[in-house]
């Protein structure tokens, strides 16, 4: 009986371990790169997985789909995904989510910039690769929570303005 219980428990825990290894998670949630009035690149990192799909549209119902690729990071199981969205309209709000196999993100939004000749006011925030600085481990949190968010609240109240591209 003890052998049977041990065999069952060993099988159960091996199964849980294998399932955990096969379940992808976001290492880095979706972020935007190289925005211009008619295209933008969406990137994200997962613990594993090949599929690189972005569903997008001008409403949260989405409706369009773009496919990209994924590459290994340092020859490990993590994958960085890249999908370019093209044919976008300038100065337009888009909604999107990313998919890698069974892993699906929340729905996010961004606004494409205007053409320079449009003479439209356009705000943006640029941040560099925020590597962990062991001398200042809370710097990114400080920049966002003590700088950017209080500024937006003082300028626009409790809502982010529509003309602020994210």
Regions found by a protein language model. Give the residues of each.
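Bacterial Sec-dependent N-terminal signal peptides
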Residues: 1-24
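Divalent metal-dependent phosphoesterase catalytic cores across multiple superfamilies
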Residues: 21-166
């Amino acid at each position: 009986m003890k052998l049977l219980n041990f065999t069952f428990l060993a099988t159960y825990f091996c199964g849980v371990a294998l399932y955990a290894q096969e379940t992808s998670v976001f290492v880095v949630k979706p972020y935007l790169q190289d925005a211009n009035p008619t295209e933008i690149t969406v990137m994200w990192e997962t613990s594993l997985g090949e599929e690189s799909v972005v569903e997008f549209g001008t409403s949260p119902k989405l409706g369009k789909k773009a496919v990209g690729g994924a590459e290994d990071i340092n020859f490990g199981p993590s994958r960085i995904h890249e999908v370019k969205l093209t044919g976008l309209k300038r100065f337009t709000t888009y909604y999107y989510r990313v998919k890698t196999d069974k892993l699906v993100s929340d729905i996010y939004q961004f606004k494409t910039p205007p053409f320079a000749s449009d003479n439209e006011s356009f705000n943006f925030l640029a941040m560099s690769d925020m590597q962990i600085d062991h001398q200042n481990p809370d710097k990114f949190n400080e920049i966002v929570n003590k700088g950017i968010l209080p500024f937006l609240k003082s300028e626009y109240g409790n809502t982010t303005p529509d003309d602020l591209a994210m």
